[in-house]
Curated annotation (Swiss-Prot):
The protein's name in its UniProt record: Putative manganese efflux pump MntP
Species this protein is from: Citrobacter koseri (strain ATCC BAA-895 / CDC 4225-83 / SGSC4696)
Gene designation: mntP
Membrane-related topology note: Multi-pass membrane protein
InterPro entries (alphabetical): Mntp/YtaF, Put_MntP
Family that this chain belongs to: Belongs to the MntP (TC 9.B.29) family.
Protein purpose: Probably functions as a manganese efflux pump.
Length: 188
């Protein structure tokens, strides 16, 4: 996977956390930068670990399905992309809209895990490709840190305008990456 695809994947994977952060930021009157950064660090750390876990699980199975790797990655990315788009259109669940006010560490970790399950599934798909998983996971974590921090800070301004549309954009990016993987397989 080239650097452009890695960056697109990283920011695509950060969209769930970004959408959750916008919702949480929209509930704050004047979020402090320290609150936003704390949220970004927690979301980013979890989002770095989950693709590594998924990649490890995928590596266990890779010897059995190596000849199908492009299809596995394509199907996972398209499935996740469609799911994100559907959630964006439907509006997701009400948990994402609960106030951030002085959230405990564990509540933030739980929210981060909930928004990073897609990254774990993507990690499974990445196990079937020749990628530097450490660099990819770090890119996903950094993008999530940036987008979550930004989401908290600007959430109250753009929450009503963008909200779950961030998930739609993230889903479209995942579908595009899946299509690129399949295209590259068939057209070299």
């Amino acid at each position: 996977m080239n650097i452009t695809a890695t960056v697109l994947l990283a920011f695509g994977m950060s969209m769930d956390a970004f959408a959750a952060s916008i919702g949480k930021g929209a509930t704050l009157h004047k979020p402090k930068f320290s609150e936003a950064l704390r949220t970004g660090l927690i979301f980013g750390a979890v989002e770095t670990l989950t693709p590594l876990i998924g990649w490890g699980l995928g590596m266990l199975a890779s010897k059995f399905v190596l000849e199908w790797n492009h299809w596995v990655a394509f199907i996972l990315l398209v499935f996740l992309g469609i799911r994100m788009i559907i959630e964006g259109v439907r509006g997701g669940n009400d948990e994402d809209d609960e106030p951030l006010r002085r959230h405990s560490f564990w509540l933030l970790v739980t929210t981060a895990i909930a928004t990073s399950l897609d990254a774990m599934a993507v990690g499974v798909g990445l196990a079937f490709l020749q990628v530097n998983i450490i660099a990819t996971a770090l890119a996903i974590g950094c993008a999530t840190l940036i987008m979550s921090t930004l989401g908290i800070m600007v959430g109250r301004f753009i929450g009503p305008l963008l909200g779950k549309r961030a998930e739609i954009l993230g889903g479209a990016v995942l579908i595009g990456i899946g299509a690129q993987i399949l295209w590259t397989h068939f057209h070299g």
